């Protein structure tokens, strides 16, 4: 069984756990419609992704 050679300091433990905190989701303004959407996601209203029509637009 693997055993740590040194005790993990509170600083190292905290730095490792800092990535576990919940973060607010990021939104960007769409260039075409001006609405907010998640980065790297399809705009569901227009059906566009990276300048191309991927889905039929919702009316």
UniProtKB/Swiss-Prot annotation:
Q: Where is this region: Disordered?
A: 1-41
Q: Which positions form S-S bridges? A: none
Note the Gene3D superfamilies from the entry.
Single helix bin
Q: Which SUPFAM superfamilies match?
A: Zn-binding ribosomal proteins
> Which residues fall in a compositionally biased region of kind Basic residues?
1-16
Query: Among the entry's GO cellular component annotations, what is one?
Result: large ribosomal subunit
KW Ion transport (keyword) present: no
- Annotated protein name in UniProt: Large ribosomal subunit protein bL32
Name its species.
Answer: Bartonella henselae (strain ATCC 49882 / DSM 28221 / CCUG 30454 / Houston 1)
């Amino acid at each position: 069984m693997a055993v740590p050679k040194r005790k993990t300091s509170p600083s190292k433990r905290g730095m490792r756990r800092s990535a576990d905190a919940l973060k607010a989701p990021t939104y960007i303004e769409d260039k075409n419609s001006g609405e907010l959407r998640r980065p790297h996601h399809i705009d569901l209203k227009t059906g566009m992704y990276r300048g191309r029509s991927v889905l039929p637009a919702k009316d």
